[in-house]
Amino acid sequence: MWIPSKLTRPGRLHNAIVRPRVLDLLQQAPYYKLVLFRSPAGYGKTTMAAQWLSDKPNVGWYSIDDSDNDGFRFVNYLLQALNKATNFSCSNAQKLAEKRQISSLRSLFSEVFAEMADFHQECYVVLDDYHLITNDEIHESMRFFLKHMPDNLTVVVTSRAAPPLGTANLRVRDLMIEIGNEMLAFDTEETTRFFNQRIADGIDEDMANSLRTYVEGWPSAMQLIALQAQHQNRTLAQTVESVSQFNHAHLWDYLVEEVFDLLDHETRHFLMQVSVLDHFNDELVFALTQREDALGLIESLNRYGLFIYPLEGEHNWFRFHNLFGEFLSHERQARIPQQEKDLHRNAAVAWLQQKSPHQAIHHAQKSNDKDLVVEILNEFGWKMFNQGELSTLEHAINKLDAELLFSHPKLTMLRAWLAQSQHRYNQVGQLLEEAEEEHKKRNIELDIHYQGQANALLAQVAINSNQPEKALELAELALSQLDNTIYRSRIVATSVVGEVNHVLGKLDRALPMMQQTEKLARQYQVYHQALWAILQQSEILIAQGYVQAAFELQDSGFRLIEDQQLQHVPLHEFLLRIRAQVLWCWNRLDEAEECAYRGLQILENHSPSKHLHSYSMLARIAIGRGELDKAGKFIEHIQHLMKQSTYHVDWTANASLSLILFWQARGNTEAMQEWLNTAVRPESACNHFLQLQWRNIVRAHINLGQYEEARQALNFLQSEARRTNLITDTNRNLVVEAVLAARQKDEEQAKALLKEALVMTNQTGMVGNFLIDGATIGGLLEKLSLRHELGDLERHRAQQLMKDISSNQRSRSIHFDEDFIEKLVNHPNVPELVRTSPLTQREWQVLGLIYSGFSNEQIAQELDVAGTTIKTHIRNLYQKLNIANRKEAIVTAENLLQLMGY
C-alpha cells in the first residue's frame, strides 16, 4: 500500500553546489516551528532541503504527489516519516492510523504528541511538494499539528505556492523561516561556481553575471544552458530552454492485476457505477444501480477488504479509498463510457432526494444536463447562497449559455448577488442592467418584487461605496416593493437602513433597525446577515458608551459563529477586530493581541490588503508596551498596504492612529507633518470613524505645536460628538483636549478636563486613551487624585492609571530596541567585547528582559518563542559578552545603560 520511495530523502547530491548563504539562514532552524521553501518549479527547493538536512541524523522525508489528498493516506505517510525522524517514538499512533481507530486527525495528533514526550532530540519531518495537497481537512489538521507539536520538532515544507498552514500568523510571531525564490535564485558567485563545475573552459565573472541577469538566477534554466553548451557546442549565452514537467505514475496496472480481475463481471460493473460518487449510502447506490441488495453488497465488499470504508459516525455511509476510487473512475470511463452521462444524471437526482443540492449540481454539470442544472439552481440556489457555497454557484451560473440564463430572472438576480457578496461592487449595476435588457428581449416581465430585490442589492452596494443617502433611498424603496415572502432582500434592506442611520450618527434609529435585522436573519437562517447585524449593534453600543453591553453582545456573535460553523468567514475577523479594540481600550493588551493574531489567521487566504486592521492593532499594542522595534515592523507593513490599496476612511483612520502614535513615540515630527499635509478632512464627524480621523488630525497638530489649529479642530470634533450623542468619542476627545491644555501650560483647565473624562470612564472603561498620553498627563492625574472633589471611584481610577503609566514607562526603559543598540555599539566608550562580538537583535532583547527580572519562562512568553530557544539565546549572549551567570548579565546590562545615560 505504501510506497517506500515516498519516504526516502533524495540522493545524488554530489553534483549540487554548496550554498552557504542559504545554509547560514537555516542555522537557527531548530528553534522555529516551520521552515518553508517556497518558489516556482525549478528553483531547487527539494535539492536545497536535502542538502541542508544531509548531515542531520533525525530526519523523516515524505514526498507528496497529487494522490495524497485523502486524509487517511496523508496521515499514514506523515506518521511513517515522523517515526523515522524520532526513532519510532510514535509507533502506537501509527497503528491507530493504519487501523482507522481515530475519531479525527486532531485526536490522532494529540496521541502523537503524547508519545513524543519522551523523545528530546532535535528532529525534522519534511513535506516535499506540499502544493499538491488541496484537501482543506489536511490543511486544518496540519495547522493544529504546527500549533501544538513539541519544541524539538521542526516541520520543513517545500511548495510552489504559499501553503494554507497559518503562515501569516507564524511569520508575524517569528516562528517560521521562509526561503523564497529570491534566496533560491543563484547569485553571481554561485553562478560562477555552478558553470565552472560543469563547463571545461570555465566562465568569467562578467559572463556569469550576464547569464544570471538573463535568467534571473533560475537554477533549472542554468542547468539547461549548461547541457546545451555541452552537447551542442554552443556558447553559454546562446542556450536558453524551457523545462518540461513530468507526471506522477499511477498504480492502475497493479490494481487491475491484483484486485479487479479477480472479481466477477457483475461486481466489477457495480463498482464502476458506484464510483461516480465520492461517498454513498444504500439509497444513493440503489438510485444508480437499481439493485435492491445495495446495502448488503456494499457491506460484503467492505468485509472482503475491497478498499471500501464506512464513514466514522455516519450510519450506512461509505467511501472508496482515494486511490481505488480514482482507479475505478478510470476503468469506468474506459469500459462503459456510454453510461457516463446517465450515471451522473441519476446521481444528481439521488443527491437531491438526500437534500444535498451542492452534490447534485456537481453531478448535473458532469452529465451536461443544463436543464437539470437550471432546475437545481432555481429551487436551491438561494439556500446554497445562504450557506456560503458561492464558488459552486458562480461556476454553475457562468457555465450556462445566455438563453438559459436570461430565461430565468431568479438566476440573473442570484448572479448579481454573487458579485456583491464577493466585493465586486462595480459589476453589480452592469449585471442588473444587462439582465433587464435581456429579459425584455425575451418578453419576460420583471415584477415589482424583482425590482425590490434589485433595489435592496443596489442599496447595499451604495453603502459599501460610502453613499449613505443614496443607500437609504434605495433601501426604503425596496422595502415598499417587497412582500414578506422575499425575506433575504427585506433583511438586507432593513440592514442597510440601520447601517445608514449608524453612519449618519442617528444611533437611536440605527440600533432598533439592526436588532430587527438580527431577529429576521435568525428566523430565516441567514446567519451571515445575523452576524453582520450583531457587529453593527456592537459598534453602535460602543459609540453610545455602553461598552460592557457591546462586549456581551460580541459574546453572542462568537456563539453564533461556533453554532453555525462560520469560523472561516471574513466577518469572524471583523468580530475579533472590534473585540480587540475594546480590549485595547481596557488595557487588556495580551487578549487584544491574541484577537489580532486570530484575525490574521482567518484572513490568511484572502488578499493581504485585508490585513490592515490586524497590523494596526498589533502596532498599537507594541507601542503601548514600549516595543518600538517590534512596532516598527508592523508600521512598515501598514505603510506598504496603504500604498498598495485604496481603503474606506474607517480603515485608514485606524491605521493612521497607529502611525501617529509611533511617530509620537519616536519624535518623528517630519513624518507627522507629511501625513497632515495629505490627511482627509471629512465634512462631518457624526460617527466613530470620522471622529477618529479628526482626532488623528488634532493629535498631529498638538505634536507639531500647532495649538490653534488643534483647538479649532477639537471644537468641531466635540460639537459633532455631542450633537450625535457619541458618548465614547466625547470621552476620548476630553483626554486629547486635556493634553492640549497641558501643552499650553493651562494646568487647571487640563485637570478639569481630565476630571470630566474620568467620570465618563466609569461608564465606558476607556483607559487606553489615557495611557497613550501618559507622559503628558501622568503628573496631572497625580495632582488630581490628591484633590477632594474627585469621587472615590474616580480617585481609584486615577491611581490605577498612574500605576499603569509608571509600569509602561518602566517597560519602555528596559527594552533594548534597534535605535538604542545602534547608539550603544557606536559609543566611543563601549567595551571592545561588545563591538567585536555583536549580539543579535533578539539577544539584546533577552539581555534587557534579564535585567528587568524576567525568568526564562517569562522571557519565552514575552517573546512568544520556545523555552529551548531562550536558553540558546542566553548561552550565545553569555559567550559573546564573557558572562558566567545571570547576576553578571544584570550588572553588564546596568553598566551599559549607565554608559548611555539611563
UniProtKB/Swiss-Prot annotation:
Pfam families, per the entry: GerE (PF00196), TPR_MalT (PF17874)
Assembly information from the UniProt record: Monomer in solution. Oligomerizes to an active state in the presence of the positive effectors ATP and maltotriose.
PROSITE patterns membership: HTH_LUXR_1, HTH_LUXR_2
Binding site for ATP: 39-46
Ranges for domain HTH luxR-type: 832-897
Keywords carried by this UniProt record: Activator, ATP-binding, Carbohydrate metabolism, DNA-binding, Nucleotide-binding, Transcription, Transcription regulation
GO function term, MF aspect, one: ATP binding
InterPro entries: P-loop_NTPase (IPR027417), Sig_transdc_resp-reg_C-effctor (IPR016032), TPR-like_helical_dom_sf (IPR011990), TPR_MalT (IPR041617), Tscrpt_reg_HTH_MalT (IPR023768), Tscrpt_reg_LuxR_C (IPR000792), WH-like_DNA-bd_sf (IPR036388)
Swiss-Prot/TrEMBL GO biological process terms: positive regulation of carbohydrate metabolic process; positive regulation of DNA-templated transcription
Function: Positively regulates the transcription of the maltose regulon whose gene products are responsible for uptake and catabolism of malto-oligosaccharides. Specifically binds to the promoter region of its target genes, recognizing a short DNA motif called the MalT box.
Annotated protein name in UniProt: HTH-type transcriptional regulator MalT
Annotated control of activity: Activated by ATP and maltotriose, which are both required for DNA binding.
